[in-house]
Amino acid sequence: MIALRLIAVTLVVAMAASTTWARSFNKRANFDPSCAGVYNRELLGRLSRLCDDCYNVFREPKVATECRNNCFYNPVFVQCLEYLIPADLHEEYQAHVQTVGK
């Protein structure tokens, strides 16, 4: 009886650990693995939204993908930044790219 309880507890702990790991893995699954800097969901989300907004303006599929290339460190991202974001915030966005990038 004690052995059965021990096995049941072990299974429950193992399942909880694997679920937590899977949830943690899935959080990062949406972002480019080339982003080798600090993982910050808020910054990555903000940069990604800029690319989404840029795609919504230009409606060209390549804009959405190229904007995110090389962890947002590319000419398309810069063009989107210049087009959509006020000039006084450009340095802030470039700092975000440096934080999450290489």
Curated annotation (Swiss-Prot):
Modified residue annotations for Valine amide: 100
Q: What is this protein called?
A: Crustacean hyperglycemic hormones 3
Localized where?
Secreted
Q: Which GO terms describe its cellular component?
A: extracellular region
The protein's matches in Pfam families, at most eight in alphabetical order, are given as:
Crust_neurohorm (PF01147)
Q: Which GO terms describe its biological process?
A: circadian rhythm; glucose metabolic process; neuropeptide signaling pathway
As given in the record, the signal peptide range reads 1-22
Concerning InterPro entries, the annotation shows: Crust_neurhormone_CS, Crust_neurohorm, Crust_neurohorm_sf, Hyperglycemic, Hyperglycemic1
Gene Ontology molecular-function annotations: neuropeptide hormone activity
Q: What the protein does?
A: Hormone found in the sinus gland of isopods and decapods which controls the blood sugar level. Has a secretagogue action over the amylase released from the midgut gland. May act as a stress hormone and may be involved in the control of molting and reproduction.
Q: Does the keyword Cell division apply?
A: no
**Organism superkingdom:** Eukaryota
Q: What is its main location?
A: secreted
Q: Which family does it belong to?
A: Belongs to the arthropod CHH/MIH/GIH/VIH hormone family.
* Keyword terms: Amidation, Carbohydrate metabolism, Cleavage on pair of basic residues, Disulfide bond, Glucose metabolism, Hormone, Neuropeptide, Secreted, Signal
| UniProt source species | Penaeus monodon (Giant tiger prawn)
Name which cysteines form disulfide bonds: 35-71, 51-67, 54-80
